[in-house]
UniProtKB/Swiss-Prot annotation:
Record's keyword annotation contains Protein biosynthesis: yes
Subcellular location: Cytoplasm
Function: One of the essential components for the initiation of protein synthesis. Stabilizes the binding of IF-2 and IF-3 on the 30S subunit to which N-formylmethionyl-tRNA(fMet) subsequently binds. Helps modulate mRNA selection, yielding the 30S pre-initiation complex (PIC). Upon addition of the 50S ribosomal subunit IF-1, IF-2 and IF-3 are released leaving the mature 70S translation initiation complex.
Family: Belongs to the IF-1 family.
Organism of derivation: Flavobacterium psychrophilum (strain ATCC 49511 / DSM 21280 / CIP 103535 / JIP02/86)
Entries under HAMAP family matching the protein: IF_1
Subunit structure and binding partners: Component of the 30S ribosomal translation pre-initiation complex which assembles on the 30S ribosome in the order IF-2 and IF-3, IF-1 and N-formylmethionyl-tRNA(fMet); mRNA recruitment can occur at any time during PIC assembly.
GO MF assignments: ribosome binding; rRNA binding; translation initiation factor activity
SUPFAM superfamilies noted in UniProt: Nucleic acid-binding proteins
Protein name: Translation initiation factor IF-1
Amino acid sequence: MAKQSAIEQDGAIIEALSNAMFRVELENGHIVIAHISGKMRMHYIKLLPGDKVKLEMSPYDLSKARITYRY
C-alpha cells in the first residue's frame, strides 16, 4: 500500500517548548505541536514566537507536525 502524502499548511509560532518543539497556530485556528525538520537543525535556523512557518502534517495524526520552512 502506498504511503499517504503529507498535508502542507501555514501557521504562526505561538510558544517555544522544550526539546526544539513549538506550539503553532494554523491558519484555520487549530493549534498543533511541531518539531523542526533535520535540514533546519543542520543549518541552525532559529525560530521565535510570531514567526510564520510552513508545516507538514501526517494524515494519520493531525495534532503533530514538522516545521519545514520559515518565511
